[in-house]
């Protein structure tokens, strides 16, 4: 099974379909393998219970007649539209990722359950029971929330919680731009353990925040107005920015790659917001804190 794209979060939101295929394969005495579209997806696959293994998309061989390949990109709902775009909403309405993938799964004949997340395998980390973790880093510069907002949010939360931010590497000396104690998670498995063990998570719309949601950890996602990746469950809330302006929408449309099925040799380039992320900059720490209090 190949997920909807190459990001860590793209695999996480695809998990209900992966898990349904694993359950079906087990009943039939077969195996389910993941076709990983990035190294981070391959590393996270080790935490998916029942998965037989993982193969890199770049090295994926042609399948034999008895094998079945489910490629979630190979569907008109994916190929013909950029999710969250005005054209998409005009055709389908304001669908979120669970509703989109449920339709794709149904067309593939897969009975996937999107009613609640089934957590990844994890090992508890001691000492995080009263810790709120902040997910501030993202590979997409168009999704950045200002450091001053994160520091203000951390200050408000410290009155009641231990507060740390998840980082993929340890900061060196004075190179750390954010004055919040760091919790390094050097690989996806370590991130799963930390995000499963903490009191809650407030994070930008990125892979680690999606992992927290998958682990049923109370999570507030800070996202752009048109993001479809928020998953609406009782333990989740979304703090959405203002609608994107015309320049931002045009830049996003120009960088869309939804018409590609295979991502072999695809070179993704981070998209920079031409408007300086004004939509997220207007969001206030107090708003995030209030949403988090709804989940306590």
Model-based region annotation:
Residues 1-92, 190-193, 200, 209-211:
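Active-site and donor-binding regions of nucleotide-sugar-utilizing enzymes
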Residues 3, 36-38, 73, 136, ...:
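Short beta-strand/turn micro-motifs composed of small residues
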Residues 53-58, 182-185, 237-242:
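Short acidic-hydrophobic, aromatic-tinged amphipathic segments that line or gate anion-handling sites
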Residues 81-143, 147, 176:
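Mid-sequence helix-capping/hinge segment at a functional interface
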Residues 146-231:
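Donor-binding and catalytic core of enzymes assembling or modifying cell-surface/extracellular glycoconjugates
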């Amino acid at each position: 099974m190949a997920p909807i794209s190459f990001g860590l979060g793209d695999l996480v939101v695809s998990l209900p379909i992966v898990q349904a295929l694993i359950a079906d394969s087990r009943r039939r005495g077969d195996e389910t393998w993941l076709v990983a579209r990035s190294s981070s997806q391959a590393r996270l696959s080790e935490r998916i219970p029942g998965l037989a293994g993982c193969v890199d998309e770049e090295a994926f061989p042609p399948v034999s007649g008895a094998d079945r390949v489910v490629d979630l990109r190979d569907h008109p709902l994916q190929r013909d539209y950029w999710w969250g775009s005005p054209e998409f909403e005009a055709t389908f309405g304001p669908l979120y990722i669970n509703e989109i993938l449920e339709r794709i799964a149904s067309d593939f004949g897969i009975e996937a359950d999107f009613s609640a997340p089934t957590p990844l395998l994890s090992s508890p980390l001691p000492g995080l029971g009263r810790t709120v973790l902040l997910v501030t880093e993202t590979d997409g510069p168009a999704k950045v929330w200002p450091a001053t907002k994160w520091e203000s949010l951390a200050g408000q939360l410290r009155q009641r919680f231990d507060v740390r931010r998840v980082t993929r590497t340890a900061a060196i000396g004075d190179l750390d731009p954010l004055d919040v104690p760091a919790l390094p998670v050097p690989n996806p498995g370590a991130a799963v353990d930390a995000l499963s063990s903490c009191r809650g998570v407030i994070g930008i719309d990125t892979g680690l925040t999606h992992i927290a949601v998958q682990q049923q950890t109370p999570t507030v996602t800070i996202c752009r107005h048109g993001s479809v990746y928020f998953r609406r469950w009782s333990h989740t809330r979304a703090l959405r920015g203002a609608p994107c302006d015309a320049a931002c929408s045009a830049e996003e449309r120009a960088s869309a790659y939804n018409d590609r099925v295979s991502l072999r040799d695809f070179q993704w380039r981070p998209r920079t917001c031409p408007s300086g992320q004004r939509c997220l900059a207007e969001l206030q720490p107090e708003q995030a804190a209030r949403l988090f209090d709804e989940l306590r």
